[in-house]
């Protein structure tokens, strides 16, 4: 009788161990899935959105590694662009790039306008309009005669200033692409037009298609973090030829340029 009790206790303990191990393995599988890794990697940056005051980045630390020189506090780089095909075979692409140097606490950048020829994937011309950031205002350094363009630049907002990715963890069943040799990682999630970020983009940009977009999260470099790699997000509303429409956003922290 004592043997049966001991055997029953042994079986109970064994079952408990298997259950605990099974739960642990399930969590590990979830943790180790590429989708989860990509979302966690992006969350480090996207958790900062929306950045109401860009100058707060002067006091914001980012991912650091051996690429930084001693004493370098690093530089934040922001980019937001809108690309749309308005003419067969051509894509108009324009946006803003801003460098916020944490050493000098100065922000410089430019607004660019370019035209890409679809057939050759070449830029016919790119015009860069130099600018800087004073307090919370964009100040043009170049003369802009087109009043409409001038207003657009001075009132420009980066996606990182109004987007909110608090629901990133809820995006499911992403299409995953990886290349360990580069390395690069990509996750695509289908969104609805009811998504708050999508609504805001439709308010800001002349997006004519009614198609709901695909959100693409792209990483070049170590998925755990790298100052020489980069991450960018893209809301792709249409990939149809001559109807291409996309919004791209990039927030990166890296070593400062000695000349900046």
Swiss-Prot record:
Signal peptide extent:
1-22
Top-level lineage group: Bacteria
Which Gene3D superfamilies does UniProt cross-reference here? 2.50.20.40
- What Pfam families does the entry give? DUF576
Q: Which InterPro entries match?
A: Csa, Csa_sf
The record lists its disulfide bonds as: none
Q: Which residues are listed under lipidation as S-diacylglycerol cysteine?
A: 23
- GO-annotated cellular components: plasma membrane
Provide the alphabetized UniProt keywords. Cell membrane, Lipoprotein, Membrane, Palmitate, Signal
Attached lipid, kind N-palmitoyl cysteine, located at 23
What family name appears in the similarity comment? Belongs to the staphylococcal tandem lipoprotein family.
**Stated name of the protein:** Uncharacterized lipoprotein SAB0390/SAB0391
Organism encoding this protein: Staphylococcus aureus (strain bovine RF122 / ET3-1)
């Amino acid at each position: 009788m004592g043997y049966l009790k001991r055997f029953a206790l042994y079986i109970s303990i064994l079952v408990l161990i298997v259950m605990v191990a099974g739960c642990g393995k399930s969590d590990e599988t979830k943790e180790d899935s590429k989708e989860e890794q990509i979302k966690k990697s992006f969350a480090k940056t996207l958790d900062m959105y929306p950045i109401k005051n860009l100058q707060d980045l002067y006091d914001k630390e980012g991912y650091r590694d051996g690429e930084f020189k001693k004493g370098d506090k690093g530089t934040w780089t922001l980019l937001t662009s809108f690309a749309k095909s308005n003419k067969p075979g051509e894509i108009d692409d324009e946006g803003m790039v801003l460098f916020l140097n944490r050493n000098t606490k100065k922000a410089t950048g430019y607004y660019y306008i370019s035209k890409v020829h679809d057939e050759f994937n070449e830029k016919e011309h790119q015009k860069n309009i130099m600018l800087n950031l004073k307090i919370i205002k964009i100040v043009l350094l170049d003369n802009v005669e087109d009043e409409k363009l001038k207003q657009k630049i001075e009132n420009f907002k980066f996606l990182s200033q109004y987007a909110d990715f608090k629901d990133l963890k809820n995006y499911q069943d992403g299409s995953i692409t990886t290349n360990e040799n580069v390395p690069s990682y990509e996750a695509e999630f289908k969104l609805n037009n009811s998504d708050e970020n999508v609504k805001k983009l439709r308010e800001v940009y002349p997006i004519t298609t009614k198609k709901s977009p695909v959100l693409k999260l792209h990483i070049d470099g170590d998925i755990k973090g790298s100052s020489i790699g980069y991450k960018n997000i893209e809301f792709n509303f249409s990939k149809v030829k001559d109807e291409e429409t996309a919004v791209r956003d990039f927030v990166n922290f890296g070593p400062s340029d000695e000349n900046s």
